[in-house]
Amino acid sequence: MTTSSNQQVVLAARPDGDLKPTDLRLEDVAVPTPEDGEVLLETIYLSIDPYMRWWMRAEKSYNDPIEINQVIVGATVSRVRQSRHGDWQVGDWVLAFSGWKHFAISNGSDLRRLDPDVAPPSTALGVLGMTGFTAYAGLRNIGKPKPGETVVVAAASGAVGSMVGQIARLRGARAVGITTGAQKLSYLTDELHFDAVADYNAPDFAEQLAKACPDGIDVYFENVGGKIWDAVLPLLNTYARIPVCGVISQYEKPSGAQENIDRLSNTMTQIMGKSLTLRGFIQTEYAEEQLADFLQEAGQWIADGKLRYREHMTQGLHTAPQALIDLLKGRHFGKTIVQVGEP
């Protein structure tokens, strides 16, 4: 490897409201050199995920916030370009957490080996990665759908939502997807075989959702929040389960903003009155015990043509800021990925 150019994207300013391209900065830095026990990784594919915007806030959540001038965090599919580590060879494909940079150093402890003959490497960021496992773990551990029950998911044409609906159907449940726009609605019913859909931007959204769920909602996979939650709440059945993996509608609210302050008290009343189970989760809490099960089961579903996925891929690290902005605005289907290097 002879290149001496290494690009990275850092947080230039803390966003207040909608993320702007000027909140991020593309920099040129030197390619690092591995020491004994280390490898040099080249990022081939970079995962773009909603949580990245949440970590740009000043407030700590389940992780420390990204600091000003710090490289944006993110999962990557990378290749070993130089190795001074006995377990890793030049050319190996790995899943890493290198962040928004072209080249990175690793001591190998945070790497997972990938086999490109088993599945396209980019799938380790989506359908066979964090997003797919988020859907799997949330349903397996919290949602626990039973045959014949109704499972509703918002942002249903996105990376997580599209997996939630398909896995629910594979478990014998009805899948109802919430999204907006004719193309996304038809994608859910025609390609992913959701049982019903509702358009959250339609004036009669609440009526559409009620019609799609004539027997109520048994599982609501929450990843959006806001007005969608307001429409879902009255339809929840007694003992319904609500896995919460995100509230993307709130990620770009200005710091300290409060909206519909009485929403929490109404939610708490419903939780008590209907004996609801509502639990937030981060997929990593289940990974050690269940990731292998997921990879085996999901891999078989894909091989059998039972689990479908889409990837929206842009080219070049410089496209990552706009890719995240577009993701937060719901402009694309499926999993958003940036191709940074050449395989």
Predicted regions and their residues:
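Short glycine-centered segments of the SAM/dcSAM-binding site in methyltransferase folds
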Residues: 93, 150, 174, 240-241, ...
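Mid-domain Rossmann-like dinucleotide-binding core that forms the NAD(H)/NADP(H) cofactor-binding site
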Residues: 125-203
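Glycine-rich beta-strand-centered segment in the early N-terminal region that forms part
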Residues: 30-48, 56-100
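NAD(P)H dinucleotide-binding glycine-rich loop of Rossmann-like/cofactor-binding domains
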Residues: 72-78, 89-155, 197
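C-terminal hydrophobic helical "lid"/dimerization subdomain
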Residues: 2-4, 285-343
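Short amphipathic alpha-helix with an adjacent loop that forms part of the alpha/beta core around
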Residues: 204-215
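Glycine-rich phosphate-binding loop and adjacent beta-alpha segment
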Residues: 227-306, 340-343
